[in-house]
Regions:
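Short hydrophobic core segments
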Residues: 164, 183-196
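Flavin (primarily FAD) binding-site architecture
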Residues: 191-209
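Central beta-strand plus flanking loop segment that forms part of the substrate or channel wall
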Residues: 210-239
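Dinucleotide-binding Rossmann-like beta1-alpha1 core, especially the glycine-rich loop
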Residues: 1-52
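Conserved beta-strand-loop-beta-strand element in the redox core of flavoprotein oxidoreductases
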Residues: 168-184
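A short alpha-helix-loop-beta-strand transition element characteristic
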Residues: 2-19, 94-101, 235-240, 305
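Conserved flavin/dinucleotide-binding core of flavoenzymes
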Residues: 173-175, 222, 236-378
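Active-site/ligand-binding neighborhood in enzyme catalytic cores
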Residues: 61-163, 171-173, 192, 202, ...
Length: 378
């Protein structure tokens, strides 16, 4: 609203239509069939909970923190354990954890690779968002309209295609050297770079040990996405939802409903996360598409001859992001966040990875406001 960018309510599009189907061990299963399936590895009281639901249901039902907003506090260090350990404490076997979380992890490569405290925060944050209501908004024409509007309001020049190579002291300020040799002096520097990109910069300032470790070791989420379009609504032929969760290579198929109405399915997003995303990256775009279309043709014969590859994107292979977002392993949440955003000389930091009260765009914006107050004279 501050930027006069028109917004559209899109939440109803995500909720529209049949819920995602479940394909497990060679079968399409309803919730009732899943609850009775011989291969269901969940405890008796959780048999009817779908694989995609159970990890989040347990995190919400049995939160480890009385106040999820304090997830990063040092006094919670004893709870800064692998999420896999928390799930085991709730009664899930290794087989159940592998199916419920490791196959499509929300954070980390698998449940052993992410802090229980980050998952507790995620559960609390998402719960607070849901409590505010079902509406969800996006900029009309794409969220890049927001950053374009922000750039248009800047008074100085925006220098594109100028990756930074080094930041070093210059008097009381800093000197920025770009890869092309161009140099720029400034009293203050604000870096919003994701840490994999920041690690590529030679920083000529002494960084405290905890902060240096946070900058060097914080991992980023592997996510790789394959977009497909279909020439016909195959789901009308087979009677299934266009979206589905599977235990195979196709993992998670999400219908995209960005037509004139939510009834129109404009495409399919197949998403790999964690270790499966890294496997996709190793195989490469063409091999992934070939295997996806082949597997979907077997799982859902109605798709045969109808699917077309459209766009493939690996966040891990992006030079200036190195992953979709920052996450924290066991032992990192209570050590890294407190030091992550401290100014280093004239260099200040913002970005989602520096924020502890929100994630996503909300976290990035909150951190940007904090950094602006740090560098603007009182």
């Amino acid at each position: 609203k501050q930027l006069d960018v028109p917004m559209a309510e899109v939440g109803h599009r995500y909720r529209h239509g049949k819920p995602p189907g479940l394909y497990f061990a060679g079968e399409h299963l309803t919730r009732e069939q899943w609850a009775q399936h011989a291969g269901n590895p969940f405890p008796a009281a959780m048999k009817s909970v779908m694989p995609a639901e159970i990890a989040f249901a347990l995190a919400s039902k049995n939160p480890p923190l009385a106040d999820w907003t304090q997830w990063y506090a040092a006094e919670n260090g004893a709870l800064d354990i692998p999420f896999a350990q928390f799930l085991a404490q709730q009664g899930l076997s290794e087989e159940a954890i592998a199916l419920a979380y490791n196959h499509i992890p929300y954070h980390g490569r698998d449940a052993g690779d992410v802090s229980n405290l980050l998952m507790a925060f995620n559960s609390g944050f998402v719960g607070s968002q849901m409590a505010a209501g079902p509406e969800s908004f996006a900029a009309e024409g794409g969220n890049y309209k927001i950053t374009d509007a922000m750039a248009a309001r800047l008074k100085g020049d925006v220098l594109l295609d100028s990756p930074v190579a080094a930041i070093e002291p210059e008097g009381k300020g800093a000197l920025v050297t770009c890869r092309d040799g161009a140099r720029y002096a400034a009293d203050k520097i604000v870096s919003s770079l994701p840490l994999p990109a920041f690690r590529q910069i030679e920083l000529g300032f002494d960084v405290p040990k905890d902060q240096a470790e946070a900058h060097a070791e914080t991992p980023y989420q592997p996510i790789t996405i394959a977009h497909l379009t279909t020439s016909e609504p195959f789901w009308e032929q087979d009677g299934q939802s266009p979206s589905m969760w599977s235990d195979g290579f196709s993992s998670q198929v999400i219908a995209q409903r960005y037509g004139e109405t939510a009834d129109e399915v404009t495409g399919l997003m197949v998403q790999a996360r964690g270790n499966l995303a890294l496997e996709w990256d190793e195989l490469g775009q063409d091999a992934v598409y070939d295997r996806l279309i082949s597997e979907l043709g077997k799982i859902r014969p109605a798709t045969k001859g109808k699917l077309k590859p459209r766009h493939f994107h690996s966040w891990t292979q992006e030079e200036f992001s190195g992953g979709a977002w920052a996450y924290y392993k066991a032992g990192q949440a209570t050590r890294f966040l407190a030091a992550m955003a401290n100014p280093v000389g004239p260099v200040h930091f913002c970005g989602e990875h520096t924020e502890y009260s929100a994630r996503g765009v909300e976290g990035a914006l909150a951190s940007a406001e904090r950094a602006a107050l740090e560098v603007v004279p009182a």
